[in-house]
Amino acid sequence: MSYDEGGEELEEIKRRKLLEYQRALEAEKAKEEQKAREEAMRQEILRRILTPEARARLSNLKLVKPELVEALEIQLIQLAESRSVRVPIDDETLKQILARLYEAQRAREVKFRVSF
């Protein structure tokens, strides 16, 4: 094998790696765009089903507990779609839902501690 053949082989490996990297970047970009579209759709639905005060409370809570709020947003959308709650959801109703969620979470923590 001559030096030229080795150089060509090295260039081919570099080209393949570059293509692989570009495909990975494109896939990541597509995934991020899909996530952004889903988030925009969820926010639009929440704008329709929550009063401004309830949305403000949810936004404030999201700063402290983003995972909880994400799960709560999905639950609120499901409740509204199944007509299990009156729309628009006002701040008082949201507080009641949050209180029930907190109590359920607390009950699970107590059971977990007792079950040692």
From Swiss-Prot:
InterPro entries according to UniProt: DNA_bind_arc (IPR022889), PDCD5-like (IPR002836), PDCD5-like_sf (IPR036883)
One example GO MF annotation: DNA binding
Asked if Zinc-finger is a keyword of the record, the answer is no
Domain of life, source organism: Archaea
Membrane-crossing segments per the record: none
Query: Could you confirm whether the keyword DNA-binding appears in this record?
Result: yes
Q: Which GO terms describe its cellular component?
A: cytosol
**Which keywords label this protein?**
DNA-binding
In which family does this protein belong, per the annotation? Belongs to the PDCD5 family.
Its recorded name reads DNA-binding protein Tpen_0471
What organism does this protein naturally occur in?
A: Thermofilum pendens (strain DSM 2475 / Hrk 5)
